Amino acid sequence: MKKVLALVVAAAMGLSSAAFAAETATPAKTAAPAKTTQTTQHHKKQHKKTVEQKAQAAKKHQKKDGKKAPAKSTSKTTSQPAA
């Protein structure tokens, strides 16, 4: 049974390789493909920021007066005098 299967597979591969060889051996009889025209893409120039815009952006990201927000205390202290 295995020999029969091997022969069938070999025959199928032989036929496919023969068909492939015949296909590649014959010269192409179709007309030459149409000539394609190349189009060039124009890229837009990037807009560069002016010096004033850069300065404004730098000011925006600076910390105000170098002060940090006061830290929240987690402990509860009662400094009110008893009445």
Swiss-Prot record:
A GO CC term assigned to this protein in UniProt: periplasmic space
Residues that span the membrane, as ranges: none
Signal peptide from the UniProt entry: 1-21
The organism's place on the tree of life at top rank: Bacteria
Compositionally biased region (Basic residues): 57-70
Biased composition (Low complexity): 22-40, 71-83
Localisation per UniProt entry: Periplasm
Alphabetical UniProt keywords: Periplasm, Signal
Post-translational modification: Proteolytic processing gives rise to the active protein.
Residue ranges of the region described as Disordered: 22-83
Propeptide: 22-56
InterPro entries: Acid_shock (IPR023497)
Family recorded in the similarity comment: Belongs to the Asr family.
Record-linked NCBIfam families: acid_shock_Asr
Function: Required for growth and/or survival at acidic conditions.
Name recorded for this polypeptide: Acid shock protein
